[in-house]
Amino acid sequence: MKSAILTGLLFVLLCVDHMSSASQSVVATQLIPINTALTPIMMKGQVVNPAGIPFAEMSQIVGKQVNRAVAKDETLMPNMVKTYRAAK
């Protein structure tokens, strides 16, 4: 229970810290194996080219699985996350 609360708190702090960085994309902080459910600790916001999933939408992909292995420091693209739909 405590770890779930701490994970949630970390997620909120990460989002608040990066809310003003609209041009950032979600980037993997570690190797993410295929079919792994994403957690906040696995991701960070970073300005990259080409742009991937906007960091502002990170909360939408937490808990979703990746459909292929994602390398450390690789940008998460919309087609890499199962059932991800971009915000309109």
From Swiss-Prot:
Site residues by UniProt (Important for ice-binding): Q30, N35, T39, Q65
Signal peptide: 1-23
Entry's localization field: Secreted
GO cellular component: extracellular region
InterPro entries with a match to the protein in the record: AFP_Neu5c_C, AFP_Neu5c_C_sf, Antifreeze_III, SAF
Transmembrane segments: none
Chief place where the protein resides: secreted
Entry's family note: Belongs to the type-III AFP family.
Role, per record: Contributes to protect fish blood from freezing at subzero sea water temperatures. Lowers the blood freezing point. Binds to nascent ice crystals and prevents further growth.
Record's protein name: Type-3 ice-structuring protein 1.5
Lineage: Eukaryota, Metazoa, Chordata, Craniata, Vertebrata
